[in-house]
């Protein structure tokens, strides 16, 4: 029997809403005429969409669409011009927030709970700490001062609201600074560290420390793994179900009298320990954050015992330039900020985010050129990196340029 009108309309709408062309961004490209192309360029409108989704998490505006349809989005220089314009728009903050969520692994802050012993912890505080890190990241990247990666990692200031000045015991100079791009009105750039309670950069933000911890105690393993994987791009295997036939015990929830979290974890890296093969790459870095409890608050004692934040960068097969001991949190982060390996990793994380995939051999030349631009004059300019990514062959083509030969 034929469909009645409502049933027919329902079928049409269902067909539209379940179509791959509605659900996905499809990129067919425009293969050059004749022969087998080494790369398939995106069409101008496809490139405009990819550019807008990466920099704005939104659709192209009229200016970008007009540039695409008018033949002004055809070269790397054209794309760089549009990218520079788009980064000056407040909409750029949304994409940077999404990147920060994934890079620092903090997107699930709304699910973080802590033991009731932490009487100041609440869902509202977790949300504020989360927003602090997102706003600090986007404001640092978009600042007119053209900040570098080192500024992000070593700054003594963060974007906090009045509640967070209490969490950080910040000076009373709150609200003297102006807001940055895309910053909510009540989040201001404020010094969050002091001589008695030091903080350095985004890795010591409360959100980063709290989410990489347990409900009651800090976790040198989680925090060290975060640095190893997210900041150094060095993989550590997931824990096995058992070691030597013995099931992995759950992490400690209490500390015996006179001991610290560190003393509970040191057996992981003890000589001849069956756990040391993996934990030696994580825990000694995580010890560098031991002055911060499970909520990310600064502490000097744990269980009545002084806390030590000394640690070691154990040589990893994937690392070339960062090994040896550090004397505490700020020394550890200073070493990270001075490491070319960290700069390369951050550039690689942006490339992966922009392409929506892990890099392949065919991306080698693009990655090399992107890093060369990023490291110009040792500036490691965060905005310049984004422009370099979008004007690369890998970004502008559906199928990247074959990197089998020498890079130009």
Give the predicted meaning of each segment:
Residues 355-358:
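Axial heme c-ligation environment in periplasmic c-type cytochrome domains
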């Amino acid at each position: 029997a034929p469909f009645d009108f409502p049933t027919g309309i329902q079928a049409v709408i269902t067909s539209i809403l379940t179509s791959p062309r509605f659900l996905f961004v499809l990129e067919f490209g425009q293969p050059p005429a004749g022969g087998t192309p080494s790369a398939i360029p995106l069409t101008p409108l496809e490139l405009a969409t990819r550019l807008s989704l990466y920099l704005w998490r939104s659709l192209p505006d009229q200016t970008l669409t007009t540039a695409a349809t008018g033949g002004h989005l055809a070269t790397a220089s054209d794309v760089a011009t549009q990218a520079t314009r788009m980064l000056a728009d407040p909409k750029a903050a949304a994409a940077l927030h999404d990147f920060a969520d994934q890079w620092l692994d903090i997107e699930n802050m709304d699910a973080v709970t802590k033991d009731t012993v932490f009487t100041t912890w609440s869902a509202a505080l977790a949300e504020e700490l989360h927003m602090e890190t997102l706003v600090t990241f986007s404001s640092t990247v978009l600042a007119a001062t053209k900040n570098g990666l080192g500024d992000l990692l070593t700054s003594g200031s963060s974007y906090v609201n009045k509640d967070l000045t209490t969490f950080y015991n910040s000076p009373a100079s709150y609200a003297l600074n102006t807001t940055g791009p895309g910053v909510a009105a009540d989040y201001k750039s404020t010094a969050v560290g002091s001589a008695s309670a030091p903080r350095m950069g985004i890795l010591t933000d409360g959100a980063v420390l709290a989410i990489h911890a347990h409900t009651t105690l800090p976790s040198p393993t989680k925090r060290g793994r975060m640095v190893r994987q997210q900041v150094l791009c060095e993989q550590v295997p997931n824990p096995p179900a058992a070691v030597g036939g013995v099931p992995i015990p759950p992490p400690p929830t209490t500390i015996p009298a006179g001991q610290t979290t560190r003393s509970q974890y040191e057996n992981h890296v003890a000589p001849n320990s069956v756990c040391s093969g993996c934990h030696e790459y994580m825990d000694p870095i995580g010890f560098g954050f031991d002055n911060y409890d499970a909520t990310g608050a600064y502490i000097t004692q744990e269980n009545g015992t002084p806390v030590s934040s000394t640690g070691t960068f154990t040589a990893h097969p994937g690392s070339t330039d960062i090994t040896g001991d550090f004397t505490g949190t700020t020394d550890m982060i200073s070493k990270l900020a001075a490491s070319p390996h960290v700069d390369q990793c951050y550039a690689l994380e942006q490339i992966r985010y922009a392409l929506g995939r892990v890099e392949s051999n065919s991306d080698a030349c693009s990655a090399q050129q992107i890093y060369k631009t990023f490291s110009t004059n040792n500036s490691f300019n965060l905005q310049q990196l984004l422009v370099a990514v979008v004007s690369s062959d890998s970004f502008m083509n559906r199928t990247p340029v074959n990197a089998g030969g020498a890079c130009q």
